[in-house]
C-alpha cells in the first residue's frame, strides 16, 4: 500500500508551535481553532511566517501522541510518503524535525504544488490530511482520505473522508480499507 501523509497538523503540532513562538517573541495573537491555518489568518502573515520559519521553531515542533510510533510501524510494511506545504527551502528543518520517522520520501513543495504532487506524482492509496479543501480535493481525485478529527476546522469532513481521534486507530482504518476496496 502507498500511504501519504501531510505533516503539519497531522504528525507535528504546528499550531502549538506557532502559539509558543508568538508568546516567546511577544507577538500579540489570539488563535481561532475554527479556522484552518494559524498563519494564513494573521495580519502581516508573510512577515510573521518568515520570522517563525527562520528560527529553530520549525525544526522543534512536537509530535502528536502516537504519530511517530504508528508511522514507523506503517513504514515497516508500506511505502510512506510525507508531503508538506512548507516551501522547499524549509526541507532541511523539516527533515531534522522528522529524523525519527522512517519515511520513504519527504516532499516540501509549497502551498501551490501540494495537491498536484500527491495526486499526480505520489498517487497514494490513502492520504492522511487535515486541510478541509485538500481532504475534498483528494477525495474527488479518487484517493481514500483519513483525517484527524481533533481540529474543529475539520468538522463536516466525514462526507469526504474517515476521521480518527487517536493515532493508534490508524492501522485498523488502513487494514479495513484494504479489505473493503
Which residue ranges define each predicted feature?
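Non-catalytic pre-domain segments flanking phosphatase-related domains
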Residues: 1-5, 176-181
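Short hydrophobic segments within beta-strands
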Residues: 6, 83-85, 128, 148
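Substrate-recognition element of Asp-dependent hydrolases with the DxDx(T/V) motif
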Residues: 58-62, 67-95, 109
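Short acidic-hydrophobic, aromatic-tinged amphipathic segments that line or gate anion-handling sites
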Residues: 106-111, 159-172
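Acidic, Mg2+-coordinating phosphoryl-transfer loop and its flanking beta/alpha structural elements
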Residues: 126-164
Amino acid at each position: 500500500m502507498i500511504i501519504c501523509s501531510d505533516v503539519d497538523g497531522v504528525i507535528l503540532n504546528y499550531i502549538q508551535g506557532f502559539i509558543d513562538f508568538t508568546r516567546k517573541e511577544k507577538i500579540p495573537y489570539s488563535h481561532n481553532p475554527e479556522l484552518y491555518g494559524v498563519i494564513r489568518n494573521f495580519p502581516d502573515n508573510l512577515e510573521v511566517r518568515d520570522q517563525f520559519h527562520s528560527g529553530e521553531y520549525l525544526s522543534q515542533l512536537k509530535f502528536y501522541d502516537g504519530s511517530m510510533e504508528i508511522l514507523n510501524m506503517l513504514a515497516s510494511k508500506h511505502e510512506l510518503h510525507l508531503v508538506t506545504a512548507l516551501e522547499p527551502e524549509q526541507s532541511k528543518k523539516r527533515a531534522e524535525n522528522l529524523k525519527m520517522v522512517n519515511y520513504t520520501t519527504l516532499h516540501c513543495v509549497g502551498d501551490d504544488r501540494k495537491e498536484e504532487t500527491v495526486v499526480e506524482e505520489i498517487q497514494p492509496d490513502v492520504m492522511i490530511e487535515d486541510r478541509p479543501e485538500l481532504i475534498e480535493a483528494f477525495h474527488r481525485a479518487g484517493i481514500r482520505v483519513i483525517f484527524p478529527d481533533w481540529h474543529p476546522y475539520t468538522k463536516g469532513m466525514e462526507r469526504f473522508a474517515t476521521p480518527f481521534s487517536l493515532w493508534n486507530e490508524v492501522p485498523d482504518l488502513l487494514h479495513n480499507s484494504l479489505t473493503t476496496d
